From Swiss-Prot:
Protein name: Translation machinery-associated protein 16
GO cellular component: nucleus
Extra information: Present with 5350 molecules/cell in log phase SD medium.
Keywords: Nucleus
Listed InterPro entries: Tma16, Tma16_sf
Acetylation listed as a keyword: no
Family to which the UniProt record says this protein belongs: Belongs to the TMA16 family.
A Pfam short name: Tma16
Length: 178
């Protein structure tokens, strides 16, 4: 008989056995339920982590697309790494006004609000990544720029976009999806 790992299938199989049966805490069926529950929790946590990573990547690319499609840069076909560095800095500093406002609003003897802590942690993490190499679309390639300008904002087409890593000095660092 095949081993069932899915929690829903396991629960369904147990309910088929008979009327409302109780499972002994040290029994074989209970251990199966515990393993299946732990497995479901682990899979859900990995899915959430992966989804969060994709959302952050999508936000970066969308920000770059908005900058590139703005009226100021509409006619420029490609950008060098120095321009890309400036765009990344503006992306990292996008919440600085709200962060400063939250710091001013907070009284001196009170702990920071959850929103302030969240914004500060995100900013610190992005700055740390920027020093090592910030993952962003390659704006120095004409084909990539054309694709970025016409990108519809979906996850599926994001894989065809060439990404590179730019550090805080404006140099390309080894990495990305090249």
């Amino acid at each position: 008989m095949p081993v069932t790992k899915s929690l829903s299938k396991l629960q369904k199989n147990l309910s088929k056995k008979g009327k409302n049966i109780t499972v002994h805490p040290k029994g074989r069926k209970y251990e199966k339920l515990v393993r299946a529950t732990m497995r479901e929790d682990k899979i859900a946590a990995k899915k959430k982590l992966h989804q969060d990573k994709r959302v952050h990547e999508l936000a970066r690319v969308k920000f770059m697309q908005d900058v590139v499609n703005s009226d100021t840069f509409k006619g420029q076909p490609i950008f060098d790494h120095a321009h890309t560095r400036e765009f990344i800095q503006s992306f990292i500093e996008r919440d600085d006004t709200e962060l400063d406002e939250l710091k001013k609003k907070r009284r001196s003897n009170r702990p920071p609000s959850n929103r302030q802590v969240l914004l500060q942690q995100r900013r610190d993490q992005e700055l740390k990544e920027f020093k090592a190499g910030f993952l962003c679309p390659d704006l120095s390639d004409a084909k990539n720029m054309e694709f970025l300008r016409n990108w519809n904002g979906t996850f599926g087409l994001l894989n065809t976009l060439r990404l590179i890593r730019i550090n805080d000095k404006g140099e390309q660092v080894v990495g990305g999806n090249e």
